[in-house]
Amino acid sequence: ALRLILLEKLERFREEYPHVRLRLFNHSTPQAVQALKNYAVDFAIVTTPISIRKPLQKKSLLNYQEILVCGSKYKDLASSPVSIHELQDLPFVGLAEGTSTREMYMNYFMENHVSFQPDIEAATTDQVLPMIVHNLGIGFYPEPLAQEVIDDGKVFALQLKEPLPQREVCLVTNSSTTMSTAVKKAIEFIV
């Protein structure tokens, strides 16, 4: 979420309000939602899938697609569409358990009757791509962020026969809290 949407908006906010202090946390979606429920954060920017109940509210900020990418070791797989079944014996790089992304891919693989157990588990999405570039496995990555390294020939996009779920970046707020003026202004810049 940070690199997909938030950095540009925070840059503009900082130019307009240079004296407002910001504190960012790097939580998984479930951790961010829990922090919001516990009043530990003012709002959360998270990726779907997400499960929330009132008093939490979500607003979609950006739709995006993830793609399956590989390093040079597996680039021959990028020459034609492949089924997820054909890839089950390859090493996968994925996010650790306890993330909504991991849960989403567990469900995706289960729906396609394939087991999913990443060989390497990363704590954050930003850790996934360097491991793929260095041929430690194949993995899913947000297409807008992968495009530059695809264009540079560092990774290769695999075309899957089974469509991947659409993802969203969402703003989540807690309607049971009173927001400060600074928080309201920050949200205005984000949405």
How would you name each of these model-derived features?
Residues 1-17, 21-25, 30-33:
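N-terminal winged-helix
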Residues 5, 156-191:
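A late-sequence structural motif
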Residues 55-92:
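Flexible hinge/capping segments at coil-to-helix
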Residues 2, 74-75, 128, 146:
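A generic structural signal for short hydrophobic patches within well-formed alpha-helices
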Residues 76-77, 91-112, 179-183, 187:
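Secondary-structure junction motif
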Residues 19-23, 115-119, 168-170:
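Residues at or immediately flanking beta-strands
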Residues 28-41, 47, 100-158:
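Hydrophobic hinge/microswitch elements
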Residues 8-12, 29-66, 70, 133, ...:
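Short beta-strand-centered segments that line the small-molecule binding cleft or hinge
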